[in-house]
A protein has these predicted regions:
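Active-site-adjacent structural elements that line small-molecule/cofactor binding pockets in enzymes
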Residues: 1-153
Length: 153
């Protein structure tokens, strides 16, 4: 179903009259306006074979939280699946922090694997939990910026 949904979205974004007859979805001629002025990137999440195949055909992949070795295996598999497909400029590997790599070295390893965007809770690296006051979270973000981000640029 997801593959058909993505195909339908791209058809509708064309701004032209389109119709569709698939295994799961069917519709007669219609158009969706206003059409996007430029392509909308499609990032696909998941780590099952169908999800990785789908991600390989689109603009990027969004991981779950994995160990560093699991992430490396998944990115390797995804890169293999992308071989032979039309290459998209600026393919995105969007990662939730690896649970075993909360350090400058760990974030550096994720960057070296090709991770282009990282999602994390930087204050948690310093022992501040989600229910902590905002000031403590901001302090954790500043520390993360100075100790991790600045050193990885």
């Amino acid at each position: 179903r997801a593959d058909e949904m993505l195909e339908i979205m791209k058809l509708l974004w064309s701004g032209e009259m389109v119709e569709f007859k698939g295994q799961f979805f069917n519709f007669k001629k219609l158009e969706m306006l206003p059409a996007p002025k430029k392509d909308i990137p499609i990032y696909v999440g998941g780590f099952s074979e169908p999800a990785l195949n789908r991600a390989a055909r689109h603009d990027g992949w969004i991981s779950d939280m994995h160990s560093l070795s699991e992430l490396e295996a998944l990115i390797t598999k995804l890169k293999e699946k992308r071989q032979g497909l039309p290459h998209k400029e600026n393919y995105e590997y969007i990662c939730f922090s690896c649970w075993d790599a909360f350090s400058l070295e760990g974030f550096g390893q994720m960057k070296n694997l090709g991770v282009t965007t990282m999602t994390t809770y930087p204050w948690m690296l310093y022992g501040t939990m989600n229910d902590a006051p905002l000031e403590q979270k901001i302090e954790g973000m500043e520390k993360f910026y100075n100790e991790i981000i600045c050193k990885l640029k």
